[in-house]
């Protein structure tokens, strides 16, 4: 770690302690060396004991800046992990940052273009149209044809700042994994890795441009969705240039009503667009919050959505799509055993799961929903409750399904905001039933069999030998499996503990050295170094032996 990273880590830890985030970890889970580190080097008191945990976490992330704010926003959509109260607190985080200097923006744009701005654009506006934590947007007109465009440029040094904070998040997640154990429901390392994938995708504007081009082509003749044109020859990793659109923010219901927009049709089209993207195209916009969705000012009786910011897109495998569609249909048929079987067949939960227990857990969660009329049942909350239940049965995190659930919640919330009487089931059921018929109908099955026949014919003679070899391998494997697994887990536990002690000792020694160089008070400085050396010795002695497992 560089000195800059250590200073950032120190600031993150101080902020977390200032808001009492360490108090949220049960004391029985915190080892003695964590408490020693906390009270020997950080003597801060929790200044926010009067606030609930979710609010404290929100305030800490707000203070830590854009990368943590976006992480909090992502966590707010993970209601399979967090309670509704915590999720609602984090949802209030706002990605608002002041714009950076227009001279820096100009220089960055010219670096990407490898030419002066005036070579490509007229009327470049130095005042940004919008500014966020990752990028900034300016308007201009194309010199070649006079078209109105917007230029989206990454903030200076944003990549280095993001990667530095991601490193700290990963280390914090590993520490929490050590405290909480391998069977914890939160799985912080997986959550941080999911966030890493998302935010690193947002750092590649060329990928956003390619996503937008693909989505635009999928709906090129649609009367429901319009994606602005991307000038691909002017799109790079740190800069993209696209058509400028004129629309009404979808959240501005007053303006939509004022122009006579058919809100019922607009809400229904939003649901249809979601299912079309997921099941027809297998490529869906996964960041459809109101800031990225506009409505055309033309043809209010035949409303047209305009979609922006295609940095985060989702895809599903054919199996995922089929299991998802069957899940929804099984839910509305109140076939809870089929839901349990689908989760096992799909591999989302272990094949060793007790089907009867899983079925009962699903029934307990889902059956009360039918006390409401069908048009009041939320698809997103059905999926959310099923995920929450499955996590109790050790469901493996499926990032693509998390994106889908988040998007579905956005779409539903948006649809019911536009038209409170929206009946999602009535809109979606015909689509799902038609798609299922197309996937599992006799013609489709016959076509799949015909496609596979040459392969099966070629490999059929090998089948008896393969069966025998697999049975023999299974017998041999079962003899050693339990012993190997036990030894491996013990080895990993020792390695995690040793690594944590060694990393903590290094941080303590370096921080103590920095404090001495800054003429800080001697006792915490030398105390930090002494504690660091002691922890290093413990970590070195507790490391696992270098031998085969």
From Swiss-Prot:
**A GO term (biological process) for this protein?**
regulation of ubiquinone biosynthetic process
Q: Where in the cell is it found?
A: Cell inner membrane
Please name the catalytic residues of this protein.
Answer: 287
Enzyme Commission number, as recorded: 2.7.-.-
One GO CC annotation: plasma membrane
Q: Which PANTHER family match?
A: CHAPERONE-ACTIVITY OF BC1 COMPLEX CABC1 -RELATED, PROTEIN ACTIVITY OF BC1 COMPLEX KINASE 7, CHLOROPLASTIC
Name the job this protein performs: Is probably a protein kinase regulator of UbiI activity which is involved in aerobic coenzyme Q (ubiquinone) biosynthesis.
Query: Would you tell me the protein name for this molecule?
Result: Probable protein kinase UbiB
Origin species? Shewanella halifaxensis (strain HAW-EB4)
Q: What is the taxonomic lineage of the source species? A: Bacteria, Pseudomonadati, Pseudomonadota, Gammaproteobacteria, Alteromonadales
Q: In the UniProt record, what gene is named as encoding this protein?
A: ubiB
């Amino acid at each position: 770690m560089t000195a800059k990273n250590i200073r950032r880590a120190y600031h993150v830890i101080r902020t977390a302690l200032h808001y009492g985030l360490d108090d949220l970890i049960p004391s029985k889970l915190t080892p003695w060396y964590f408490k020693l580190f906390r009270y020997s080097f950080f003597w801060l008191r929790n200044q926010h004991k009067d606030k609930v945990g979710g609010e404290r976490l929100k305030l800490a992330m707000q203070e830590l800046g854009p990368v943590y704010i976006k992480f909090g926003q992502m966590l707010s959509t993970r209601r399979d992990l967090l309670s509704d109260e915590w999720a609602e607190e984090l949802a209030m985080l706002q990605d608002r940052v002041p714009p950076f200097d227009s001279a820096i923006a100009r220089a960055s744009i010219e670096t990407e273009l490898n030419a002066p701005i005036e070579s490509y654009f007229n009327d470049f506006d130095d005042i940004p149209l919008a500014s966020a934590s990752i990028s900034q947007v300016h308007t201009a007109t194309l010199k070649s044809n006079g078209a109105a465009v917007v230029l989206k440029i990454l903030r200076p040094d944003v990549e280095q700042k993001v990667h530095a904070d991601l490193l700290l998040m990963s280390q914090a997640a590993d520490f929490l994994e050590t405290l909480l154990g391998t069977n914890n429901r939160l799985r912080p390392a997986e959550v941080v890795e999911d966030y890493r994938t998302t935010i690193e995708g947002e750092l590649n504007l060329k990928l956003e441009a390619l996503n937008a081009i693909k989505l635009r082509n999928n709906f090129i003749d649609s009367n429901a969705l319009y994606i602005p044109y991307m000038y691909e020859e002017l799109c790079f990793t740190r800069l993209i240039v696209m058509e400028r659109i004129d629309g009404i923010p979808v959240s501005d219901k007053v303006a939509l009503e004022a122009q006579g927009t058919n809100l019922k049709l607009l809400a229904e089209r939003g649901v249809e667009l979601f299912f079309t993207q997921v099941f027809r195209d297998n490529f869906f916009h996964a960041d459809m919050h109101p800031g990225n969705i506009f409505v055309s000012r033309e043809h209010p009786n035949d409303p047209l959505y305009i979609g922006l910011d295609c940095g985060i897109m989702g895809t599903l495998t054919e199996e995922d799509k089929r299991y998802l569609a069957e899940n929804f249909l099984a839910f509305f048929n109140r076939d809870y055993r089929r839901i349990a079987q689908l989760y096992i067949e799909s591999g989302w939960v272990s094949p060793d799961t007790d089907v009867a227990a899983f079925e009962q857990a699903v029934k307990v969660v889902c059956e009360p929903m039918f006390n409401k009329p069908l048009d009041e049942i939320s698809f997103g909350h059905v999926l959310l409750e099923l995920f929450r239940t499955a996590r109790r049965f050790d469901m493996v995190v499926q990032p693509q399904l998390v994106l889908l659930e988040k998007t579905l919640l956005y779409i539903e919330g948006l649809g019911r905001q536009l038209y409170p009487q929206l009946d999602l089931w009535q809109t979606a059921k015909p689509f799902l039933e038609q798609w299922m018929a197309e996937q599992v109908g006799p013609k489709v099955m016959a076509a799949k069999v015909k496609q596979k026949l040459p392969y099966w014919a070629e490999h059929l003679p090998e089948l008896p030998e393969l069966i025998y070899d697999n049975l023999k391998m299974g017998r041999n494997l079962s003899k050693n499996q339990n012993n190997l697994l036990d030894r491996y887990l013990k080895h990993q536990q020792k390695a995690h503990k040793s690594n944590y002690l060694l990393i903590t000792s290094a941080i303590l020694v370096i921080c103590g050295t920095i404090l001495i160089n800054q003429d800080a008070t001697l006792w915490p400085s030398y105390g930090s170094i002494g504690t660091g050396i002691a922890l290093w010795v413990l970590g070195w002695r507790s490391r696992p032996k270098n031998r085969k497992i």
